């Protein structure tokens, strides 16, 4: 499994089927990049300038909303993930 370092988080993006107002299903090439996902792994936390380690607020299993162009897309074990910093996460859902 992927183990992110520091304040990074591994996200499994939630794919939703997009339809127009008239009910036409959009192909993958026309879809917006998803901004919602599930946290599958978290790093150990960030370190402040004076060496203090601050734990991350998100945890494995959290559903989150993140910045549209945040992170780095990676493929691991046949699945696609997004690795981003906790500061790129805008909200925890639920």
From Swiss-Prot:
Short name of one Pfam family: Cpn10
CDD domains in the cross-refs: cpn10 (cd00320)
GO-annotated cellular components: cytoplasm
InterPro entries: Chaperonin_GroES, Chaperonin_GroES_sf, Chaprnonin_Cpn10_CS, GroES-like_sf
Swiss-Prot/TrEMBL induction comment: By heat shock.
Cellular compartments annotated: Cytoplasm
Principal subcellular localisation of the protein: cytoplasm
PANTHER family linked: 10 KDA HEAT SHOCK PROTEIN, CO-CHAPERONIN GROES
Family statement drawn from the similarity comment of this UniProt entry: Belongs to the GroES chaperonin family.
Subunit structure: Heptamer of 7 subunits arranged in a ring. Interacts with the chaperonin GroEL.
The name this protein goes by in its record: Co-chaperonin GroES
Source organism: Halalkalibacterium halodurans (strain ATCC BAA-125 / DSM 18197 / FERM 7344 / JCM 9153 / C-125) (Bacillus halodurans)
Lineage, highest ranks first: Bacteria, Bacillati, Bacillota, Bacilli, Bacillales
Protein encoded by which gene: groES
